[in-house]
């Protein structure tokens, strides 16, 4: 009997050691973050093991594991929910049950997942869209798009743009009872990247007459030029989104060729002839002083021109919205940006805030202290719940 108890004790110690990860002092409910990280870490290990054995691609396995979050379209007494397609792109629509004679606000939402997994039917996305539709009395469109590694850039951008452009057709807006003067776009992480890129593209499309009233970018990924930002240095090994995982997301967005990932990890993937673009992502001039924290800017080492020729997407503004010239930013709508303290993507958002402000765009920046990447998806945490409410309240006041 004593041996059995001793065995359980050893097992408990090992399990606690596997779950425990040191976290900063200002992180609320650290055990919730540790348990979440344990699930993500275990999924990652299993996916990597399967890839090493040649059973499945890492991202395909991660997408498979994440499907446990899938939630069918379920209407309730307040919101009608249904799945349909906009010009063959799958979307989930949320429409308030209450009848109204006036037109409603419209929000077009793009999910995250590193362009490799994620879906509008994940429980956290479904719940956030449902809350948004109910509290704003708005029509919410939550779109899907084809994913890497099966599909690479610009497929994801094109899918989202196709769905949004269909929605913005005046006849389609009328059929859903949406006010053409009160439409916003929103996205988180990779979805924030797509939202920013799509908002820029709309300004150049003569076929689209409807103007967005707001854009909300939730811890967006906005550039693949420099992976040596202070946020990448400080948060490289924190839970949810490590530097190595984010770099893999970026490389898979363009190709399954591992040589690109290797070059990105060493920050040697941008050719000399494109060095003029670094001014758009130079954190030494774009980050607020309090986020520099004594970090020294290192001029990136230039990479092979062959990589850029094989994968021109790495230089495309549709993939990296921070590469847009100031003149292209000036027409963008009122913008709300969320960044998180412990997130490798923090500085992408901070730099975009600075560039938008310098271009005359009105920007509201909500920096969430003590939060990790993906916090709005973690509505079971206090910080995630607060951030979601702040996001919805801002939309209520400005959309």
Curated annotation (Swiss-Prot):
Keywords, in A-Z order: Disulfide bond, Endoplasmic reticulum, Glycoprotein, Hydrolase, Lipid metabolism, Membrane, Microsome, Signal-anchor, Transmembrane, Transmembrane helix
Glycosylation sites recorded in the entry for this protein: 282
Record-annotated membrane-spanning stretches: 5-25
Lipid bilayer topology: Single-pass type II membrane protein
Pfam families reported for this sequence: Abhydrolase_3
Disulfide pattern: 116-340
Renumbered ranges of motif Involved in the stabilization of the negatively charged intermediate by the formation of the oxyanion hole: 111-113
Catalytic activity: a triacylglycerol + H2O = a diacylglycerol + a fatty acid + H(+)
Family according to the record: Belongs to the 'GDXG' lipolytic enzyme family.
PANTHER family, alphabetized: AB HYDROLASE SUPERFAMILY PROTEIN C4A8.06C, ALPHA_BETA HYDROLASE FOLD-3 DOMAIN-CONTAINING PROTEIN
Entry protein name: Arylacetamide deacetylase
Taxonomic source organism: Bos taurus
């Amino acid at each position: 009997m004593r041996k059995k108890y001793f065995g359980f004790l050893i097992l408990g110690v090992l399990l606690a050691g596997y779950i425990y990860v040191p976290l900063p002092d200002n992180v609320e409910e650290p055990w919730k973050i540790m348990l979440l990280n344990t699930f993500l870490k275990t999924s990652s290990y299993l996916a990597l093991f399967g890839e090493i054995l040649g059973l499945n691609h890492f991202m395909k396995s991660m997408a498979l594991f994440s499907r446990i979050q899938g939630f069918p379209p379920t209407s309730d007494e307040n919101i009608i929910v249904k799945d349909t397609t906009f010009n063959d792109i799958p979307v989930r629509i949320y429409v308030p049950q209450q009848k109204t004679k006036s037109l409603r606000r419209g929000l077009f939402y793009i999910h995250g997942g590193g362009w490799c997994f994620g879906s509008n039917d994940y429980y956290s996305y479904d719940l956030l869209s449902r809350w948004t539709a109910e509290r704003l009395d708005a029509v919410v469109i939550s779109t899907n798009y084809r994913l890497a590694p099966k599909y690479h850039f610009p497929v994801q951008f094109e899918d989202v743009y196709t769905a949004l452009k269909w929605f913005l057709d005046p006849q389609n807006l009328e059929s859903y009872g949406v006010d053409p003067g009160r439409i916003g776009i929103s996205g988180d992480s990779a979805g924030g990247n797509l939202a920013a890129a799509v908002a820029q593209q709309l300004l150049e499309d003569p076929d689209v007459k409807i103007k967005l009233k707001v854009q909300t970018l939730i811890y967006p990924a906005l550039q693949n030029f420099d992976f040596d930002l202070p946020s990448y240095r400080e948060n490289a090994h924190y839970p949810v989104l490590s530097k190595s995982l984010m770099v893999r997301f970026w490389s898979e967005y363009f190709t399954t060729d591992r040589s690109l990932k290797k070059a990105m990890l060493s920050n040697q993937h941008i050719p000399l002839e494109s060095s003029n673009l670094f001014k758009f992502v130079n954190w030494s001039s774009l980050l607020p002083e309090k986020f520099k924290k004594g970090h020294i800017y290192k001029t990136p080492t230039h990479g092979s021109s062959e990589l850029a020729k094989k994968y021109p997407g790495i230089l495309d503004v549709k993939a990296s919205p921070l590469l847009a010239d100031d003149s292209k930013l000036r027409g963008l709508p009122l913008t709300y940006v969320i960044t998180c303290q412990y997130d490798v993507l923090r500085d992408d958002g901070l730099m975009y805030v600075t560039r938008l402000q310098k271009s005359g765009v009105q920007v509201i920046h909500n920096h969430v202290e003590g939060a990790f990447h993906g916090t709005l998806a973690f509505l079971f945490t206090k910080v995630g719940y607060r951030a979601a409410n702040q996001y919805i309240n801002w939309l209520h006041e400005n959309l």
